[in-house]
Amino acid sequence: MSSRSYKRVLLKLSGEALMGEDAFGINRSTIVRMTDEIAEVAALGVELAIVIGGGNIFRGVAPGAQGMDRATADYMGMMATIMNALALQDALKHKGVDTRVQSALNIDQVVEPYIRPKALRYLEEGKVVIFAAGTGNPFFTTDTAAALRGAEIGAEIVLKATKVDGIYSADPNKDPTATRYARISFDEVIVRRLEVMDATAFALCRDQKLPIKVFSINKSGALKRAVSGEDEGTLVHV
């Protein structure tokens, strides 16, 4: 069995990752595969918190939101993340993984509100905690929510699951000579103008000395390898 390099981690999942090959919504086989990977990591004894996006259902900055009040559109996006969190919780339940959802928006009949001491207790008890509704405020992305919650719970690293297997010197889909960085500092990312997270989220991680690992969620076993400290994806360090 693989060993863990981190005791407590924050996993950022995009809503789009749940679509799989579909154009919208939640692809069942994709969410089942993701929960297999999450369950495998939880079995290592890693304290795992997850922030999930809502882009597979609605995004405040998407073309469909054009003409809408930005705050209203962002609140709709937050509610989309709650739907995704419930779907992920249900799928994890079927794997026997004890999971709690905490929302930054109060919907008491559906999910419990975000309360930091409770979240910490759940993690210490070995439960997976899913943070929904972003930060609870418009104009902030779920990347920023991941950085914020990661800092609040004392995570040792933010694991950003994407469609590419790390940070490259250029777009690998356009430039065949693009190379993947195994490790890169926060300062180097800024100098090279590489895209990792939105500026607010990136600055928060940098200020809190919270490393980020970017890896592909579509690569089998990548999450476990990232948690085990293997050469998977790209590590952004201080």
Swiss-Prot record:
ATP binds at K12, L13, S14, G15, G55, R59, T162, Y168, D171. UMP binds at G54, D74, T135, G136, N137, P138, F139, F140, T141, T142. It catalyses: UMP + ATP = UDP + ADP. Homohexamer. GO terms for molecular function: ATP binding; UMP kinase activity. This is Uridylate kinase. Inhibited by UTP. Pathway: Pyrimidine metabolism; CTP biosynthesis via de novo pathway; UDP from UMP (UMPK route): step 1/1. Disulfide bonds: none annotated. The gene is pyrH. HAMAP family: PyrH_B. Pfam families: AA_kinase. InterPro entries: AceGlu_kinase-like_sf (IPR036393), Asp/Glu/Uridylate_kinase (IPR001048), Uridylate_kinase (IPR011817), Uridylate_kinase_bac (IPR015963). GO terms for biological process: 'de novo' CTP biosynthetic process; UDP biosynthetic process. Belongs to the UMP kinase family. It is found in: Cytoplasm. Gene3D superfamilies: Acetylglutamate kinase-like.
